[in-house]
Amino acid sequence: MVLNWRGVKSRLYSGKRRIDGRNKGLIAIRSRGGALKRKYRYIEHYKQKWMDKWLFVMRIEYDPNRSAHIALCSILKEGIYFYVISIAKLEVGSLIITSALKLGTLQVGNTTKIKNIPEGLLINNIELIENSGSKISRAAGTSSLIIKKYNKKYSLVKLSSKECRLISNECYATIGTVSNIERKLKQNKKASYSRKRGIRPIVRGLAMNPVDHPHGGRTKGGVHWKSFSGKLAYNVSSRKKTKMTSRYIIIGHRKQKIMDKQIKNG
């Protein structure tokens, strides 16, 4: 197996071209650039390829391109290797499976349709559209909660952003929480921690010249806060009002956070 792995390794990795916050040569995100070189690991987000096949977890690795850890899985009989996002409490040597049918045991790491998962269970790597691959709850320590089965077609799911939305029962999801839960406790004690990740120092717009930023120049106040490109900032929604998926949002994340505060205050 080791000899086979040495040959397959080059097919799971590739070089990664650094964008440094640019889009077609123009600055899209300020204060980005200068990160360490890294190789990109190909992650399998569409697990329906390996339907009803047992996947053997060979090892759990660190991935510099994302906050969560990744797990190297293999189908031993066929000699196939690929990476998936690792789940918390997933151990080396365990077996996981993807199935469209109802699973006998709700083991952490198994993937199935939302209609087969009971209410009150934490899930991650959720599809938004059927057979489109996982899109939601892929960052470290994130998970979503199935609140209730809304009807035969949809389930009401509470995302990690506190947003409550309807998701089709035919969409696939993985049971459990994404790995590396302790990442939120990590502190950047030195500037080099940020520079190695490609985050450069941020200059306030107020300290710039008028030609460089809407807040620049001696005159203070008189206008609403804006971004460097001139768009309104601070407590202004950037989501398109005509977006098709807005019809599936029952409670937005802003409204849900206000409701949670009111419940705590009594």
UniProtKB/Swiss-Prot annotation:
Q: Where in the cell is it found?
A: Mitochondrion
Q: Which UniProt keywords apply?
A: Mitochondrion, Ribonucleoprotein, Ribosomal protein
Task: Give the record's GO biological process terms.
Answer: mitochondrial translation
A GO molecular function term, named singly, is: RNA binding
One GO CC annotation: mitochondrial large ribosomal subunit
Record keyword Glycoprotein present: no
Where would you say this protein principally sits, based on its record? mitochondrion
UniProt xrefs under Pfam families: Ribosomal_L2, Ribosomal_L2_C
PANTHER family assigned to the protein according to its UniProt record, in alphabetical order = LARGE RIBOSOMAL SUBUNIT PROTEIN UL2M (PTHR13691:SF5), RIBOSOMAL PROTEIN L2 (PTHR13691)
What family does the entry list? Belongs to the universal ribosomal protein uL2 family.
Q: What's this protein's name? A: Large ribosomal subunit protein uL2m
Q: Which gene encodes it?
A: mrpl2
